[in-house]
Amino acid sequence: MESMPVAPSTDPRVARLIDANLDRAREGLRVIEDWCRFGLDRQDLVVPLKDWRQQLGQLHHDRYRQARSTATDSAAGLGHPAQDTRTDSVAIVKANASRVQEALRVIEEFARNGDAVLARTAAAVRYALYDHEVRILEACGHSRRKQQLEDARLCLITDPGADDGCERLVQRVEAALQSGVSLVQYRRKHGSDGLRLQEAQQLAQLCHEHNALFIVNDRIDLALLVNADGVHLGQEDLPYREARRLLGSAKLIGRSTHKLAQLHEAQEQGADYVGVGPVFATATKADRHPAGLSWVKEACEAARIPWFAIGGITATTLPRVREAGAQRVAVVSAIMASEDPASASRQLLDLLT
């Protein structure tokens, strides 16, 4: 890369300041880089960070290092209470991105007249990091959601009837969430888009208050409007690539599968999870012939991503589904049609542990 001798500075304090901020910027980049490498397993996010760190390292000339004097730094060891509030990876990434951006701005200002190459490099890296931070945070959001998905054992799918109002739906979902359900898929086949939007908004807020995932069935527009955690698509819905382009990289995409070829296709395309079914006959999919427990056994052997057995599963039939290899199930009527959705949820969760 381009480099040049650094002209002597009449003020050694500037060299010391630049040294401190080069250390700050490179250390912050390394923190973010290591999370992208080990936490997100995203080489595409690691490469630019490593390159920027190397660029700054090559411009960290001896004259700056020789001006270092931590023993006389009046602010050495000075902390701030906000540092103790970084309790998760996202907070750490944000804090270190800000740290790098601030350090680069300081370098840019003070190096402009004495080290033009360093000043230009600092400015270029700073602007590039603004956009790169967004990509990293999107990846963090997807990683967090995928972990929640891995942990989920029971998915509640709503299927309110044409006469069911929003209040009753919300009450039943809330009872399930309070009982431990951690994944809700909103599906309404009857009703206006206005009603769907109203229900989806309330359910999304409710799920996020309970730290549960909220997925919208079919409707990418609704999912985006209510900031859902993702969408679930049937075999006749939008192709995965187009859905991902609309949703962005941070959201989850699930796909219904009814045979092995569809499961393989969903995995190859990048789906985050799949539904496997219908296992038994079900009123919600009356036109589809049950695939049976043999399909569950096939999925158990072939799936490399989280999958949920679905279709006619109740507390009575769940043990057979578990014996076939399913660790996760999705239900509709077993909870939504129950007189006591809270107890029904607890019973199903107990059978899944």
From Swiss-Prot:
Recorded GO MF terms: magnesium ion binding; thiamine-phosphate diphosphorylase activity
Region (Unknown): 1-128
Binding positions (Mg(2+)): D218, D237
Co-factor remark: Binds 1 Mg(2+) ion per subunit.
Cofactor or coenzyme needed: Mg(2+)
Amino-acid positions noted as binding 2-[(2R,5Z)-2-carboxy-4-methylthiazol-5(2H)-ylidene]ethyl phosphate in the UniProt annotation, renumbered to this chain: T282, A283, T284, G312, V332, S333
CDD domains noted in UniProt: TMP_TenI
Gene3D superfamilies documented for this protein: Aldolase class I
Enzyme class: transferase
Keywords: Magnesium, Metal-binding, Thiamine biosynthesis, Transferase
Pfam families: ThiD2, TMP-TENI
Binding site for 4-amino-2-methyl-5-(diphosphooxymethyl)pyrimidine: Q185, Y186, R187, R188, K189, N217, S256, K285
Reaction(s) catalysed by this chain's protein: 2-[(2R,5Z)-2-carboxy-4-methylthiazol-5(2H)-ylidene]ethyl phosphate + 4-amino-2-methyl-5-(diphosphooxymethyl)pyrimidine + 2 H(+) = thiamine phosphate + CO2 + diphosphate; 2-(2-carboxy-4-methylthiazol-5-yl)ethyl phosphate + 4-amino-2-methyl-5-(diphosphooxymethyl)pyrimidine + 2 H(+) = thiamine phosphate + CO2 + diphosphate; 4-methyl-5-(2-phosphooxyethyl)-thiazole + 4-amino-2-methyl-5-(diphosphooxymethyl)pyrimidine + H(+) = thiamine phosphate + diphosphate
EC number: 2.5.1.3
Transmembrane listed as a keyword: no
GO cellular component terms listed in the entry, alphabetical order: cytoplasm
Pathway involvement of the protein, from the record: Cofactor biosynthesis; thiamine diphosphate biosynthesis; thiamine phosphate from 4-amino-2-methyl-5-diphosphomethylpyrimidine and 4-methyl-5-(2-phosphoethyl)-thiazole: step 1/1
Record-annotated disulphide pairs: none
Keyword Membrane: no
Region of interest (Thiamine-phosphate synthase), residue spans: 129-353
Homology family: Belongs to the thiamine-phosphate synthase family.
NCBIfam families reported in the protein's UniProt record: PRK02615.1 (NF002727), thiE (TIGR00693)
UniProt cross-references to HAMAP family, sorted A to Z: TMP_synthase (MF_00097), TMP_synthase_cyanobact (MF_01327)
Function: Condenses 4-methyl-5-(beta-hydroxyethyl)thiazole monophosphate (THZ-P) and 2-methyl-4-amino-5-hydroxymethyl pyrimidine pyrophosphate (HMP-PP) to form thiamine monophosphate (TMP).
Designated name of the protein: Thiamine-phosphate synthase
Source organism (scientific name): Synechococcus sp. (strain WH7803)
UniProt lineage: Bacteria, Bacillati, Cyanobacteriota, Cyanophyceae, Synechococcales
Recorded name of the encoding gene: thiE
